[in-house]
Regions:
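Acyl activation and transfer enzymes in specialized metabolism, enriched
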Residues: 1-18, 106-152, 191, 196, ...
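A generic secondary-structure signal for well-formed alpha-helical elements
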Residues: 20-31, 68-75, 146-151, 186, ...
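Short amphipathic alpha-helices and their capping loops
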Residues: 40-109
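Short, flexible turn/loop "capping" segments at secondary-structure junctions
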Residues: 103-107, 174-179, 280-284
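Flexible, non-catalytic linker and terminal segments flanking ANL/adenylate-forming cores
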Residues: 53, 58, 65, 71, ...
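Extended, hydrophobic beta-loop-alpha segments that form or line the acyl/peptidyl-thioester binding
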Residues: 14-20, 155-162, 196, 265-329
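Active-site-proximal acidic secondary-structure segment that organizes catalysis
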Residues: 1-42, 300-314
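His-Asp-centered acyl/peptidyl-transfer active-site segments
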Residues: 51-61, 75, 127-136, 150-260, ...
């Protein structure tokens, strides 16, 4: 199967694959048909009703506005270091500019995949389980620590993280694409130990999930209104999706059916670097880096992956070590 991501997300794909096998065994062996899908339009109308709820909207807006009130304007960080922001400041004639330009002309994207071995993957998963952390938040910590390291120890880091709005049975079985991205902004000092930093990110993400019905475009609009940033600028260079897709399907007639998923670039994107992390059938994980070739090369992805792994495995081995010490030692 080759699906367009605009039509279906990974959660929808899981349901579809299971249903396809159930349909096969229904026609081949006479087993029951898969359960009826929930009508997509019905779920969409519920979404629109939530969005139109003035009290809910006010709470969501307050959450995002409070972040800006407390922390002020975000600060751009780039995997290529502070020279990128300095270049934007020169182009716009503003030495205090805190956002950088989005590439709008040369949008070609290349892909570089790296495979993490099963035993190493299991170490990360065990750490998450033992400390009640999600893999997403551990990955966010790895990326933000690298960004901090290559940007002279910058403490204020923002990464765009994709989430799936499928918390109910109806949402899970309604098909379509229900992914949405929100900025995960944390200010973490170098004295903070690795585990505490992971919990800081997790606490922020948990709060974001509570307000995930909010339109992310409104967050951008509010920042433009407050900080008067130039058109086509952003505070983020990195985007993350973690997809815990199963690598096998259990079917009552067919037994265990192994499956393999791979993401393809459509050739163009306005995101400078978009990392998708998924599980592989051998028990490992695949790190798929999609990057704009106008400004990035494969070597940039090699450095990012290499240092992400150094940071993560140093951190899980010595969770009491400070973020500053980890950045120095790796």
């Amino acid at each position: 199967l080759h699906m367009d991501h605009r039509l279906i997300d990974s959660c929808g794909l899981v349901v579809m694959i299971e249903d396809l096998f159930q349909l096969y065994t229904h026609y081949r062996y006479g087993t029951a048909c898969p359960q009826e899908l929930v009508d997509f339009e019905t779920v969409l109308k519920k979404d629109l009703a939530k969005a139109g709820n003035e009290k809910r909207f006010a709470k969501d807006k307050k959450f995002w506005d409070d972040q800006l009130d407390a922390l002020g304007e975000p600060l751009y960080s780039d995997i290529q270091g502070p020279s990128v922001l300095e270049g934007a400041r020169k182009r716009h004639g503003d030495p205090k500019l805190r956002a950088s330009d989005i590439e709008m002309n040369e949008l070609f994207v290349a892909v570089k995949d790296y495979h993490l071995e099963p035993y190493a993957t299991q170490n990360l998963m065990d750490f998450c389980m033992n400390h009640q952390l999600s893999m997403t938040n551990l990955l966010l910590l790895g990326i933000r620590t690298y960004l901090s390291k290559v940007n002279n120890g910058q403490e204020d880091i923002t990464i765009q993280n994709f989430i799936s709005r499928r918390s109910t049975h109806d949402e899970w079985t309604s098909g379509g694409s229900r992914t949405i991205m929100f900025p995960c902004r944390t200010v973490i000092s170098p004295e903070t130990d690795f585990l505490s930093a992971a919990y800081e990110i997790q606490n922020m993400q948990n709060r974001i999930y509570m307000h995930s019905n909010y339109d992310p475009a409104l967050i951008v609009d509010e920042m433009r209104k407050r900080y008067h940033t130039p058109e086509h600028t952003s505070y983020e260079s990195c985007y993350l999706t973690y997809q815990p897709m199963p690598v096998k399907v259990e079917n009552e007639m067919l037994g265990t059916v192994r499956q393999h998923a791979k993401w393809f670039a459509n050739g163009a994107a306005t995101k400078k670097m978009y990392l998708t992390v998924s599980h592989t059938e051998d028990g490992g994980m695949n790190f798929s880096y999609h990057y704009q070739t106008a400004h990035l090369e494969e070597h940039d992805m090699e450095l990012l992956y290499y240092y992400m792994m150094r940071i993560l495995f140093k951190g899980i081995a010595e969770p009491d070590m400070s973020i500053g010490e980890i950045m120095e030692q790796v």
